[in-house]
Amino acid sequence: KTPGRTQHINLFELGPRDAADALFADLPGYGYAAVSRTDKQRWQKVMADYLDVRRSLAGVVLMVDPRLGFTDLDLQLLDFVGPRLANRAVKLLVLLTKADKLNRRDGDRALQQARDTLAGISTEASDIGVTLFSALNKRGVDDTAVVLRSWVASLRPAAEPAA
């Protein structure tokens, strides 16, 4: 609930209780957390290693406060996952958080600025989405769930053709 409190990789099962479809990994935040610079650098290395090594990684959800825009660390993360996005090895969903604090014009502007930033790493093959999101008023929650479900579905092996 409190931003910046995640200090480990936390895994959550998605899907039915007795037969999870996938795991959701919550990685430590690196912008807001009130911890030492050394800890933040250690987290960055953990995240970079995780994003680089996990071949089963289907996608990355990057949460950005649209009032602040993409931070330098966000841009570094995008550069890091860029090659995997370009060859469609992973997908990206950027959630512009705290959308309840934006009026319509500011929300539209934030979406356009995010799209402009993401255009720098986007290719025809990449699967990149961006949406306004608010946990408070549930804006974007259903759309995000649809995207995550589609990621899980894309991991399932194709059904054998009928004989």
Located regions from the model:
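Residue-level recognition of specific faces of alpha-helices
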Residues: H8-L11, D26, V60, G129
